[in-house]
């Protein structure tokens, strides 16, 4: 992060703009909207500045830049078409420990100004760090269309209710659940937009007096195979509402960066052949946190119901009477194959797909005879350590040694790596790869050279 986003309180504080043209005028509007006590210095001014000065909204200082104008300032903006003058303003401000923005020269500035979506008191700022103002503007336009104009009224009304809500609800968790109900209540939003005081009061009283469910809950969320862009919208909503997020090592850092900042994070990383935290203990963590009345998200790589032990975890919650729900995720087989250019089914090569775990509970045995049949695709999860055995068993049961195979490491991530070969090479290929990896076996692998679209490291 090159810039720390902050919101400045400038009301009745001295600010300086050097420049009297159109660019300076746009900056002046923002500072005036923020209530700043504004001085503008330039050799000449466009008419808007004169109009503002005549209305007593700002002070004009006509003439060359004088560094003493900065002596009482909190913030300055250099907005002239003279690079040397802008640099001089910046250096003078720096010497006085005053933040200074230099228009169109972010490297010379000590702060930059973002694109703003104004739903006062709710404010959203978008910045590209000065590298691409056009991109920031396009993002702002998209956000403008997503955020209702009356959102500011809802935020302002919430501010008026804070004291009462604090008295009504004893804990932070209860208050947060109330606010979540209020902010998604369409009737209240519409009543505020229409200034319908009777409806506002009725809806508010109903929301405040409606009993809250003090039980916690657990939401099982599939994080997808790695690329944060593959996290579902509902999954994103859940991790941003969670009090506690229990996650494993298959959840990428990019996805964890989307978690609500003040949520507790509990790492229970697991890998094939080694469990950092025993499954029974994970079950108890979920139960314990939910019994405290917290909203718990169990965040799992891929899909929680495909080799994710989601069923085992939910059985514990069900037996204890804890409410739960499930948000599916894109499973590794689907994500890794798509990002590797390998269709799992194809009219000419595969009419079915089998998803198989590479390690079983002690004493488990696969139906190798059926797995060795043609016209299907096999996908082995967590099979890297058993690759040589998989190779041997499939060949023993009749699968041709030249059957195409691929191993996908860190599928869908920028560090994705894919190697392919034949079944007779599977054990050898596996020694070149690291976990997490997925093994794909079938004629469809032969289409990879033609259909691969994602970079291969």
UniProtKB/Swiss-Prot annotation:
PANTHER family, A to Z: SIROHEME SYNTHASE (PTHR45790:SF1), SIROHEME SYNTHASE-RELATED (PTHR45790)
Family membership: In the N-terminal section; belongs to the precorrin-2 dehydrogenase / sirohydrochlorin ferrochelatase family.
Entry function: Then it catalyzes the NAD-dependent ring dehydrogenation of precorrin-2 to yield sirohydrochlorin. Finally, it catalyzes the ferrochelation of sirohydrochlorin to yield siroheme.
Enzyme active site: 248 (proton acceptor), 270 (proton donor)
Keyword set, alphabetical order: Cobalamin biosynthesis, Lyase, Methyltransferase, Multifunctional enzyme, NAD, Oxidoreductase, Phosphoprotein, Porphyrin biosynthesis, S-adenosyl-L-methionine, Transferase
InterPro entries listed in its UniProt record: 4pyrrol_Mease, 4pyrrol_Methylase_sf, 4pyrrole_Mease_sub1, 4pyrrole_Mease_sub2, CobA/CysG_C, NAD(P)-bd_dom_sf, Siro_Cobalamin_biosynth, Sirohaem_synt_dimer_dom_sf
Tree of life domain: Bacteria
Gene name, Swiss-Prot/TrEMBL: cysG
Region of interest (Uroporphyrinogen-III C-methyltransferase), ranges: 216-457
Descriptive protein name: Siroheme synthase
Region of interest: Precorrin-2 dehydrogenase /sirohydrochlorin ferrochelatase: 1-204
Keyword Ribonucleoprotein part of the UniProt annotation: no
CDD domains: SUMT
GO biological process, alphabetically ordered: cobalamin biosynthetic process; methylation; siroheme biosynthetic process
The keyword Secreted appears for this protein: no
GO molecular function: NAD binding; precorrin-2 dehydrogenase activity; sirohydrochlorin ferrochelatase activity; uroporphyrin-III C-methyltransferase activity
Any one Pfam family match given in the protein's UniProt record, by short name: TP_methylase
Catalytic reactions of this protein: uroporphyrinogen III + 2 S-adenosyl-L-methionine = precorrin-2 + 2 S-adenosyl-L-homocysteine + H(+); precorrin-2 + NAD(+) = sirohydrochlorin + NADH + 2 H(+); siroheme + 2 H(+) = sirohydrochlorin + Fe(2+)
Amino acids binding S-adenosyl-L-methionine: 225, 301-303, 306, 331-332, 382, 411
Species this protein is from: Escherichia coli O157:H7 (strain EC4115 / EHEC)
Residues where Phosphoserine is found: 128
EC id: 2.1.1.107, 1.3.1.76, 4.99.1.4
Record: residues binding NAD(+): 22-23, 43-44
Pathway annotation: Cofactor biosynthesis; adenosylcobalamin biosynthesis; precorrin-2 from uroporphyrinogen III: step 1/1; Cofactor biosynthesis; adenosylcobalamin biosynthesis; sirohydrochlorin from precorrin-2: step 1/1; Porphyrin-containing compound metabolism; siroheme biosynthesis; precorrin-2 from uroporphyrinogen III: step 1/1; Porphyrin-containing compound metabolism; siroheme biosynthesis; siroheme from sirohydrochlorin: step 1/1
């Amino acid at each position: 992060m090159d810039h720390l986003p902050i919101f400045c309180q400038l009301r009745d504080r001295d600010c300086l703009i050097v420049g009297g043209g159109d660019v300076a005028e746009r900056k002046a509007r923002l500072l005036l909207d923020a209530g700043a006590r504004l001085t503008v210095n330039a050799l000449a001014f466009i008419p808007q500045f004169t109009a503002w000065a005549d209305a007593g909204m700002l002070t004009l200082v006509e003439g060359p830049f004088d560094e003493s104008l900065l002596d009482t300032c909190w913030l300055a903006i250099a907005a002239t078409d003279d690079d040397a003058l802008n640099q001089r303003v910046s250096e003078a401000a720096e010497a006085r420990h005053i933040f200074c923005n230099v228009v169109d020269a972010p490297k010379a500035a000590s702060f930059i100004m973002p694109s703003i979506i104004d739903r006062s008191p709710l404010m959203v700022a978008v910045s590209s760090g000065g590298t691409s103002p056009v991109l920031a503007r396009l993002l702002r336009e998209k956000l403008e269309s997503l955020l209702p104009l009356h959102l500011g009224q809802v935020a302002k009304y919430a501010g008026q209710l804070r004291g009462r809500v604090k008295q009504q609800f004893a804990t932070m968790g209860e208050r947060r659940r109330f606010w979540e109900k209020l902010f998604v209540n369409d009737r209240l939003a519409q009543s505020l937009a229409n200034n319908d005081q009777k409806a506002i009061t009725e809806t508010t009283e109903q929301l405040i007096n409606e009993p809250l469910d003090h039980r916690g809950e657990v939401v099982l969320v599939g994080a997808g195979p790695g690329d944060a862009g593959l996290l579902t919208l509902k999954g994103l909503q859940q991790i941003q509402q969670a009090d506690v997020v229990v996650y494993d090592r298959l959840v990428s850092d990019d996805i964890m960066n989307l978690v609500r900042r003040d949520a507790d994070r509990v790492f229970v990383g697991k890998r094939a052949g080694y469990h950092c935290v025993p499954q029974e203990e994970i079950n108890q963590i979920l139960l314990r946190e939910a019994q405290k009345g917290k909203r718990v998200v169990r965040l799992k790589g891929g899909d929680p119901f495909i080799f994710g032990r989601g069923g085992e975890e939910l059985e514990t919650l069900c037996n204890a009477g804890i409410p739960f729900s499930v948000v599916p995720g894109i499973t590794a087989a689907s994500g890794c194959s798509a990002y590797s250019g390998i269709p799992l089914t194809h009219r000419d090569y595969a009419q079915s797909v089998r998803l198989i775990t590479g390690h079983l509970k002690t004493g488990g045995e696969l139906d190798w005879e059926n797995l060795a049949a043609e016209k299907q695709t096999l996908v082995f999860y967590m099979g890297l350590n058993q690759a040589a055995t998989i190779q041997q068993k499939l060949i023993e049961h009749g699968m041709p040694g030249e059957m195409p195979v691929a191993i996908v490491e860190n599928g869908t991530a920028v560090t994705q790596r894919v190697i392919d070969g034949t079944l007779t090479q599977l054990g050898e290929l596996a020694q070149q790869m690291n976990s997490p990896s997925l093994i794909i076996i079938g004629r469809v692998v032969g289409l990879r050279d033609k259909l691969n679209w994602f970079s291969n490291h």
